[in-house]
Amino acid sequence: VRIGLLTEGGYPYVSGDAGLWCDRLVRGLGQHEFDIYALSGSERQEDDGWVSLPPQVQCVRTAPLWAAEDDGVVYGRRARRRFEECYGALAAALCKGGASDTSADSSGAEADRFGNALYGLAELARDEGGLVGALRSEGAVRILERACRAPGALRTAHEARVPELLAVAGHLERALRPLSLDWYEDDGLGAVDLCHAASGGAAALPGLLARHFSGVPLLVTEYGVRLRSHYLASNAGPAHESAPAVRALLAAFHGRLAAEVYGQAACVTAGNAHARRWQERCGADRAKLRTVHPGMDASRFAEVGESPDTADPHTLVWVGRVEPAKDLVSLLHAFGEVRKGEPKARLRIVGAPAGAEGAAYLGHCKALAAQLFPDEAEGPHAVGDNPVSFEEIGAPEAPTLAEAYASGAVIVLSSVVEGFPIGLVEAMFCGRATVSTDVGAVVEVIGGTGLVVPPRNPRALAEACVALLRDPERRTRLGAAARARALELFTVEQNVEAFHGIYLEIVSRRPITRLALDATGDPQPFAVPAEAHLPGHWAKTEPPAGATAVSPAVEAAR
């Protein structure tokens, strides 16, 4: 099978999102051919270069999302009219709100209008050579303004001023850049058997257009739902970009785009049930949804997982990226309660800060730990020691990630916000008992192999930790069960095998019949066998339970 792998800001670049799982997927499926179509996220990412590519990668085509030169295309009167109609329909659909903001009938009509406008713009870009100049023009801003002022538009859209309109128009121009690419010809995405978008949003746009122009089926994988990410980041920009009108219109655009992607995809995979619920909320058909857990390398934790008795029985370990969402403050307060019941308990916090905010938060946590737990000494002549330590991977105390997990009897996760808890899976690979807060996909990942408590509840967190510290046999049982669960569900091998099966299923259900031409350009006879169009059920079917088999003689008499 020839796969067109679509990425945004990741593979095959050295830096970026989702690069590791894409690389493992491509390397693990050596029986397939891969064409990589990558949208880069920054100039620095392009300068960093690519990872080494395996031989099954046939070609790589890239395009920058962070910059686009003016294509120099000047539209004639007819092309301008087509652009005004399509862009006007797109803007009108956005001004009516997102996919979940209206009634079912009107929402379906607006979804059709959005999809038709999107494909109309793509066809215009294909015919005229690009959309960049038109999307950056003053005419595009005026079209957007008319849509915002039209009767029936969102109230927040009516309030959009010139700076807000310019911000929305600029965002739409960047988001629609894939429409102007030359990837959709017969020697590009039109030649693949299946498009696999490694995320939603811009990465899935080329897959939508390949389906529109060439009938190529689309598979979409989301380990983090792009629409949710947009919602979380919508307040982080400058004032004119976080105004209510801008947020409403851009949320409508991303919501409509997500609904169109989910509607046209042959299959949509989520990394966990949390992401799957978001996909259903955004319009994905439940029949198309599959859960494929992220695949992680278990080999580096094998030695620790097979030697569960190496841990200090009094040590709690937290491992992760230091930032406010990890709620280390609650963990420190909980550890104060733990020390009341288990005076020998120690807490190791292993991780580096995430940016300036993380560094400030780490400083705050260190000050709080010094205040809550003054240095203690065993005797009058001994040196005082703090029961809480802050370390980083690579330091003498924690040379490797596996050794950090190995040092603890109980691994603690105290987050208030979490997507897929990678650190929790790593602890499970190590065969360690865990105490986690009920956020994100924690319950789905841990199952019944660890203790789960409400977030922002230091007392509940402390009680769970004390219960495990006092019961070594229970820790051993939970650790063994957690390791078995992780090896069954979260390895690279199961992830690769799941996608291999999905590829074959999609291609078998939606085969592409292309017109085969000979050297002279004439149709090649017998290129497609007649049985390719023969209707029938090719899968073996079993009679329903309790049914009576009919003999051939009786069937002939009928």
Task: Say what each PLM segment does.
Residues 451-458, 467-473:
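Conserved acidic donor-binding segment of nucleotide-sugar-dependent glycosyltransferases
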